[in-house]
Amino acid sequence: MSDKLVLVLNCGSSSLKFAIIDAQSGDDKVSGLAECFGLEDSRIKWKFDGGKNEAKLGAFTAHREAVEFIVNNILAEHPELAAQIKAVGHRIVHGGEKFTRSVIVTPEVIQGIEDCASLAPLHNPAHLIGIRAALASFPALPQVAVFDTAFHQTMPEKAYIYALPYKLYREHSIRRYGMHGTSNIYICREAAKVLGKETKDTNIICAHLGNGASVTAIKDGKSVDTSMGLTPLEGLVMGTRCGDLDPSIIFHLVKQLGYTLDEVNNLLNKQSGLLGISELTNDCRGIEEGYQDGHKGATLALDIFCYRLAKYIASYTVPLGRLDAIIFTGGIGENSDLIREKVLNLLAIFNFKVDDNLNKAARFGQQGIITQVGSPIAMVIPTNEEWVIAEDAIKLITAK
């Protein structure tokens, strides 16, 4: 029986990953994914004791229903496991400048997360649903919030300050924050092991690619630049987010086309990206199927996605000085050999040479180098944000 079990809830914009993890060993006792929120085939899958399970959540369900299913179905069937849980850990995308490290959840912390919701409109509200559901279901357990933005507090000013009047930062904290920090912590640690280096001596570029996507330059184990900005909207092309664009487009939409600001916000966050370009889907699996079938919109969306990603990776060699490896992670990064190949081919100036067999083998949880011997290194590492969250949760409640 472990005294370090943590229930981790990781509420994404269109999915919810959950796990009961031994914070010391990283072993999953239960792990699962609820996905396709807002669609007709919303579902939940989980593993327990070697067995795989799946259930439908119902059409157009989302985070709240997924949390209720975990509590009322999965944990209710295994009360002995539920009794061993020492804390609930929550991944929080945006903590602004208020939260620079993980914290135990209090009413003040909940309010702080809510105050940052405008900076992560697809995520922080979902996190709050998870926190409130967990507080109701586990009133006696400490709850811990782990912030994606905390890892990026090591960025220098030249990386996080926008070219706006400085008083906007000084008075209103408008700056680059970055996300996916919890994933970056794990990836850097695991990449260092593969490379035979200490984390503090490791220089990598991490491409975390999912429905939300970002690139981070990590020098000597610390974040020095990242593609997401004040909010998760900046940077790469994503599932429904536009990423970088000329800010004057917003003025044009409002003044010339009659959009309201709320409509523009919805357009840029929920109707753009892969979905907007392809006019097909925000799901990269569907985009790849369309690409293989010759669908014009899907092909264009995939090409723009890969081109933008390759440009960011190339630019992030600037702050590193030395590049030990490019790491692909996240749902797309871990499973799309097509996107990895296209991106590395676009980086031909750096002499990356993809090993077709290794690249195709690195899918469905398989980790490994995907480039040829003698080539600069690119590898796939499945992320494990949940383990990092569990570790922080146990550290905090032990230190109380």
From Swiss-Prot:
The record marks 180, 241 as: Transition state stabilizer. InterPro entries: Ac/propionate_kinase (IPR004372), Aliphatic_acid_kin_short-chain (IPR000890), Aliphatic_acid_kinase_CS (IPR023865), ATPase_NBD (IPR043129). The keyword Kinase applies. It comes from the Bacteria. Coiled coil: none annotated. Keywords: ATP-binding, Cytoplasm, Kinase, Magnesium, Metal-binding, Nucleotide-binding, Transferase. Its cofactor is Mg(2+); Mn(2+). GO terms for molecular function: acetate kinase activity; ATP binding; magnesium ion binding. The keyword Repeat does not apply. Belongs to the acetokinase family. Homodimer. This is Acetate kinase.
